[in-house]
Amino acid sequence: MVLTVAQDRALPSGPFESSHRSLQSGLRAWVERRTHHPLGYVEQLYTFADRDRTEAGARVISISYLGLTRQVRAAEGDARWQGWYRYFPWEDHRAGTPSVRSQMIAPRLAAWAKGAPTPAARRERRQRAAMVFGLDGQGWNEELVLQRYELLYEAGMVPEATRRADPLCLSPLPGEPMLHDHRRILATGIARLRAKIKYRPVVFELMPPSFTLLQLQQCVEALAGQRMHKQNFRRLIEQQELVEETGQIATETGGRPAKLVRFRRAIQQERAFAGTKLPVTRAT
């Protein structure tokens, strides 16, 4: 889920003001003021400064952040929670390969590659399409969210590219557009989070104080956009000693009662250090 504003077409943002002690404190203040929703874990993501980032054409520099929070209550004002696959339907492989990839993206990228001016350019386009979208026998890499979006933009297959007057833009792919380059920023954040969940327990920020292992697995699957083998997932959680039992049972599971677990205190302490300015690293 992603917290949006402007009728679901933008990410929360605002100008840096002299009263803000730091960029991060300014971010937290703006997001909470705009959405009435406090942030937990925050890290700087990327600086966007390309030309023509806005319809007005003004040169705007944006410093983006990845912020995590639990959806403990409904957003307020014009802020609303939206599933991020609404903006990137080709990224959700939990029910298998999405039809938009095979039925729309693959053939249109093939046509785009064929339209390149030279044999070398045609070959380079085909190779890029195969690599980032897992075509022609290539494997799917869930972390290449930004590369996929940027390739579709370059090929003129997303609404944000219509300013370039490319003929392919007349029939954009499914997936809600966003204002300016906010969908590119969102793609960058999803890619960062998909990579980070593999080596840091940031998923802690998204879970309630106690939960079942199935709920944890479903959260990870929603982030990665892929199904995970139940027993392999639980074995990995046990090997890494991420959680401990609470001694309580969840009965409202829609099936058999399940044990409630929580993240171990050591994991929570690592989370506390992650947001500081100290260069804290994992022990080797």
Where are these regions (language model features)?
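Positively charged, polyanion-binding regions of nucleic-acid-associated proteins
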Residues: 190-211
